[in-house]
Amino acid sequence: MIDLKFLRENPDLVKENIKKKFQDHKLPLVDEVIEYDKKAREAQQEADDLRAKKNQVSKQIGALMAQGKKEEAEAVKAEVAQISKRLTELEPLEKEYQDKVLEDMMKIPNIIDPSVPIGKDDTFNVENEKFGEPVVPDFEIPYHTDIMERFDGIDLDAAGKVAGNGFYYLMGDIARLHSAMTAYARDFMIGKGFTYCIPPFMIRSNVVTGVMSFEEMDAMMYKIEGEDLYLIGTSEHSMIGKFIDTINDESKLPYTLTSYSPCFRKEKGAHGIEERGVYRIHQFEKQEMIVVCKPQDSKEWYEKMWKYTVELFRSLDVPVRTLECCSGDLADLKVKSCDVEAWSPRQKKYFEVGSCSNLGDAQARRLKIRVKGEDGKKYFAHTLNNTVVAPPRCLLYTSPSPRDS
């Protein structure tokens, strides 16, 4: 969520940013926010003036009564009653206008970084850099599920009976490999100075709306029936939520956390779930990292964070590349984002294994994550997140040979 004062003073810039994200249907929201914000401030000003007048006039009643001026006192009482009546009308009206402003502001996308390429969807994402030489075999490589089945390491049929498509049982050595990958990623990030964290796997609705857009929420989140709780789609949401409604000492920043968690996702949208694999599924495990820092440090942390993921995969001898996400592929709260993609020898192409994002102060503004500087002034922190590794997406078989296939 952008700053209301910024929108009020720069409506054309906000509209231009909406156009860059190919969300022209949201353009009317800017004028609507300005209109309702004006009404809210006018209602607030009128209410403040009336309260001051009420206090002033009310003091006259006792004095008039003491002077025996009953009729004048009654007239003043009637005036106070009229003021009170108007205040009862204004207070809900002011809240209605403020709620409408907040509702619209939650839908307006964050201002993207000038370096973000302009494009409508992920087909316009731009390759930044490659790391490692991709293996291009001249023989057919089995599907990853087939490889796991050879080791009795996966049971999709049983999972389908128990939970439906998009779930799996990992068994034996494959399950151990999965756990080992998670432990390796955990220790890798601890070695980078991050604090290990196991967060809650459910979060309340005010945290959900604080960390993501309504579109993301609808496409991803599972709600617990009858409860104000959602299963997390990624642990970054729970970790960022840790700082909700806090005022943090500037000297203690940055906060750097890494966490393991199961992740639960509807996977609604163009991609959907993968019928016979472990790539796009409803439940998986992931090691994640987040940073809460000063605004002037977020660009530097962004560069560090995606490089950590690249370093992790290169330590496993997996070729990777980074893609700069274009404007239309950025979620609404993101200022800048890049995908890390790993090479698949079987598919002979790269596929996404992680995503690094700088959200500026959007999440902090929604969740009221503030920082107190040395001068005593308060400001909103910047937040970033990045995938360390999602083990189901980590290549199980990266150095194939004709004999193995």
Label every PLM stretch briefly:
Residues 298-335:
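Extended C-terminal subregions enriched in glycine
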Residues 211-214, 328-348:
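Short glycine/threonine-rich loop-to-helix capping motif typified by GTGT followed
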Residues 1-134:
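N-terminal alpha-helical targeting/anchoring segments
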Residues 386-396:
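Conserved phosphate/anionic-ligand binding catalytic regions in large, soluble enzymes, centered on
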Residues 336, 346-365, 370:
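A carboxyl-terminal module marker
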Residues 204-205, 324-331, 356-358:
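Short, solvent-exposed loop/turn elements at beta->coil junctions and helix N-caps
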Residues 397-404:
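Conserved small/polar residues in nucleotide/adenosyl-binding loops
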